[in-house]
């Protein structure tokens, strides 16, 4: 991809992944675990002492790409958080290594900012493509955000930020909704 903002690049990479799998126009909720399996990635849980680390993505010659979800991280304990973290790690495995090059990426507070922003945007677009969002009315208050986030199986903040990034809500509404969640 040409040089661009990490979030824009993440959105574009997710759109490419969805189109490649004929899921971009689908208004159905993505089974990210199945997509991960189809990509040949194994997913396991691990109990890391550092609770800030959400997951580890590993790939390289001689072994199958893998994601290890840190069961001690609070985000990974919810279905919505687990789906987002898995989609985020899938971005690292698909796009943060050249063919045949090894990758060891831990998602935590000290990970490279641009790489993490791109993976976050990838995860949001993968889980909330336009065809899925357009199927539902844009939430106008916190209760509608909670309801739609539960329906779409994503986090409330993920939903609000993605709606803003996609132009469904303005900056004022975004701030109001985030303050009230």
Predicted regions span which residues?
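Short juxta-domain linker segments that transition from a proline/glycine-rich
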Residues: 1-181
């Amino acid at each position: 991809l040409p040089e661009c903002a990490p979030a824009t690049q993440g959105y574009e990479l997710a759109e490419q992944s969805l189109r490649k799998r004929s899921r971009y126009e689908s208004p159905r909720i993505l089974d990210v675990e199945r997509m991960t399996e189809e990509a040949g990635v194994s997913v396991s849980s691990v109990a890391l002492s550092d609770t800030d680390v959400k997951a580890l993505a590993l790939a390289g010659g001689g072994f199958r790409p893998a994601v290890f979800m840190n069961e001690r991280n609070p985000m990974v304990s919810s279905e919505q958080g687990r789906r987002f973290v898995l989609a985020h790690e899938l971005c690292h495995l698909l796009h943060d290594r050249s063919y045949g090059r090894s990758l060891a990426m831990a998602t935590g507070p000290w990970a490279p900012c641009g790489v993490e922003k791109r993976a976050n945007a990838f995860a949001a677009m993968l889980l909330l493509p336009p065809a899925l969002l357009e199927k539902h009315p844009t939430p106008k208050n916190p209760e509608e955000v909670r309801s739609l986030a539960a329906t779409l199986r994503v986090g409330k903040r993920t939903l609000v930020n993605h709606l803003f990034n996609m132009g469904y809500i303005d900056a004022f509404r975004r701030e109001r909704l985030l303050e009230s969640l």
